[in-house]
Amino acid sequence: MHKDIATPGRTKEILARYGFSFKKSLGQNFLIDTNILRKIVDAAGISGDTGAIEIGPGIGALTEQLARRAKKVVAFEIDSRLLPILADTLSAYDNVRIIHQDVLKADLHAVIAEEFAEVSDRMVVANLPYYVTTPIIMKLLTERLPIRGMVVMMQKEVADRLAAKPGTKDYGSLTIAVQYYTEAEVVMTVPRTVFMPQPNVDSAVIRLTKRSHPPVAVEDEEVFFQVVRASFAQRRKTLLNNLLNNLPDGKEKKEQIERALDAVGIDPRRRGETLDMAEFASLSNALMPLFRV
């Protein structure tokens, strides 16, 4: 068994050998605690039948733990300076493929079809770069990839938003988008002290398990998400105010919006954050006539 990458000493040694300096613009913070990495792999339920997709492998600390358990690991790395380091640190593992590409531009359906044809279980496992956490999560969800789900580390504040309940300060349009596609659960909080360099915030690991079908029935997903976003546009405003100001031609359609709210029994004076997903679904279905040209 090779010496783990994720220790302060080994990480420093690897970085010094390659003269690597962190790029703040890429949100590079490397984990230096093997125990936490193993817990992430455990939380993802990685087995010999799993194909794992990793985003931002850094110097390979998590990749190594995944490679020891998964059938195959495909990792997307945007920073070309890390490619020779990964080729070195992961040289003992023949089940790892590094793709030098921005995952936001990748055709993930094609990658999964090509790389994971022989695996029965597919999972995204990653320590996500903080500056692009939300776009990456939304890409993975909206593209409806053939995966079981994802276990990802992110800023604690964002993880709390993904797993939030209605009526709380963290609950918002991102919460609903994520929980429409998955069941969200914060697995653990990770202190900032186990990273190099140390970030300014604590992190959390969240498990998003893909739902076989959405928990609510909506006539049109695009309209549903548009209504949700409009309802949270200004948190201190009432639902009616937000809908009038943020739906297309909302002000001209005040009567229709009021009728729709009345039809589904939602008080127009409520705030968006008090509505649960089922209420948003009924409301967006009732507002469908506004979106028909």
Curated annotation (Swiss-Prot):
Gene3D superfamilies: Ribosomal RNA adenine dimethylase-like, domain 2 (1.10.8.100), Vaccinia Virus protein VP39 (3.40.50.150). The keyword Transferase applies. GO terms for molecular function: 16S rRNA (adenine(1518)-N(6)/adenine(1519)-N(6))-dimethyltransferase activity; RNA binding. It catalyses: adenosine(1518)/adenosine(1519) in 16S rRNA + 4 S-adenosyl-L-methionine = N(6)-dimethyladenosine(1518)/N(6)-dimethyladenosine(1519) in 16S rRNA + 4 S-adenosyl-L-homocysteine + 4 H(+). Keywords: Cytoplasm, Methyltransferase, RNA-binding, rRNA processing, S-adenosyl-L-methionine, Transferase. It is found in: Cytoplasm. InterPro entries: KsgA/Erm, rRNA_Ade_diMease-like_C, rRNA_Ade_Mease_Trfase_CS, rRNA_Ade_methylase_Trfase_N, rRNA_adenine_dimethylase, SAM-dependent_MTases_sf. Transmembrane segments: none annotated. It comes from the Bacteria. Its EC number is 2.1.1.182. GO terms for cellular component: cytosol. It is an enzyme of class 2 (transferase). Specifically dimethylates two adjacent adenosines (A1518 and A1519) in the loop of a conserved hairpin near the 3'-end of 16S rRNA in the 30S particle. May play a critical role in biogenesis of 30S subunits. PANTHER family: DIMETHYLADENOSINE TRANSFERASE, DIMETHYLADENOSINE TRANSFERASE-RELATED. Belongs to the class I-like SAM-binding methyltransferase superfamily. rRNA adenine N(6)-methyltransferase family. RsmA subfamily. This is Ribosomal RNA small subunit methyltransferase A. The lineage of its organism: Bacteria, Bacillati, Bacillota, Bacilli, Bacillales.
